[in-house]
Amino acid sequence: MDRRLLLSALLFIALACSSNRVHGALNRHSFPEGFLFGTGTSAYQYEGAVDKRGQNIWDTFSRIPGKIADGSNADIANDFYHRYKEDLNLITAMNMDSFRFSIAWSRILPNGTISGGINKEGVEFYNSLINEVIAKGLKPFVTIFHFDTPQALEDKYGGFLSENIVKDYVDYADLCFSLFGDRVKLWNTFNEPTIFCMNGYATGIMAPGRCSPYASASCAAGGDSGREPYVAGHHLLVAHAEAVRLYRARYRAAHGGEVGITQVSHWFEPYDAGSAADRRARRRALDFMLGWFMHPVAHGEYPPAMRRLVGGRLPAFTAEQSEMLRGSFDFIGLNYYTSNYAVAAPPPNKLHPSYLTDNWVNATGYRNSIPIGPPAYTPIFFNYPPGLRELLLYVKRRYNNPTIYITENGTDEANNSTIPISEALKDETRIGFHYKHLQFVHKAIQEGVKVKGYFTWTFMDCFEFGDGFKDRFGLIYVDRATLARFRKKSSYWFADFLRR
């Protein structure tokens, strides 16, 4: 027997035997009928096969020395492009209901536009993937854009800094709806626009790597940290609204699907609960992180705090755009990883404006040197399950109780090549993380929040953008040298938790 197969078989036996339910009575049947349990991926982080698509901004960014923590790239990634059929078997083995993945814009349209040509091989790949997902008894949950702007459009007009992106994105979304919408019933226009705009245009630590010189000397692409994040976000919101309007007019009646947008937010607690200034800071922190993209799709305008503090650097919606944005979702995706304390900050330096300081808030994970929750491997993340319930209740109150899918929740550990794989698979911390968060999701549902699903991040260890492969979020371990897959203990725990 192949040594890797033998090792995998032995690990299967050991971990399966130790995967008995280690927590209380909560399980799949505790949640409402039809509740979706799933796991997620994204195209650039998983697919590989870079030679079979057009270039995107991450292909360019990852080749700039120093931009990726471990110097890696995602040319091969997890080679999901060639291994998806066997990989989907791992998802069904965990008794999941749904698989969340994204379509690579440049794999469908290598030059970013319809006129630039459609890649038939790319279309065939996604058709085959969707068909296989359904054949496995899984519901496809598809993201149209997950940070990977075609490089051709970045070169042509600056990507999301130009209003030209709106038409090209809507054309691309239209093509996706027409090609795959007969089988895909859950569409997500954009993933985490806050992260895309903040780190792509304010800090420069993610593609396209733009920021002001005073924000970072390493932003060789140039930029304006006080203006460009808002410009890119504005065009993204208009593109989202146009795509939703098109779907509702052209496809919804025939396909019967739904379209949403995935937001991301920390929960924030006031550093000093007795301080009115810190309580106001908590509200501003939520407005700038969640409200930036949630308020427009719910109310047709930016949060009042953003309009007041950002002023003329924040673009204004036309009356038509505002009307189009208002209610432009059937559901909200919500990604949650951590909570912070919000501390009222003094007015920022007017000569150095930045999205990062416009909210007049200092966020920290520590109060009196005590963390808000156990720190994860990624230093900005803290394990604080009550924060997810608080965030869900906040969205319910502030935004008229929308339908919510928790589209990402997860924790990581270091990619430590010095320990045996058999030890790396023992991820008890991840089991406790998900169980405790699911307890608070269950509680929020009992309190009237319309949560319809919970997706782990991530299905298997993958390229984590600026961190490269140095951390592992997956339920499945990937050996970077061989790309062999090994089930972690958490994957067996989910199989037990989700037993039908």
Swiss-Prot record:
Residues 1-24 form the signal peptide. Its EC number is 3.2.1.21. Disulfide bonds join 211-219. Glycans are attached at residues 111, 362, 409, 415-416. Gene3D superfamilies: Glycosidases (3.20.20.80). It is an enzyme of class 3 (hydrolase). The active site is at residues 192, 408. Keywords: Disulfide bond, Glycoprotein, Glycosidase, Hydrolase, Signal. GO terms for molecular function: beta-D-fucosidase activity; beta-galactosidase activity; beta-glucosidase activity. It catalyses: Hydrolysis of terminal, non-reducing beta-D-glucosyl residues with release of beta-D-glucose. A beta-D-glucoside binds at residues 45, 146, 191-192, 337, 408, 457, 464-465, 473. GO terms for biological process: carbohydrate metabolic process. Belongs to the glycosyl hydrolase 1 family. This is Beta-glucosidase 28.
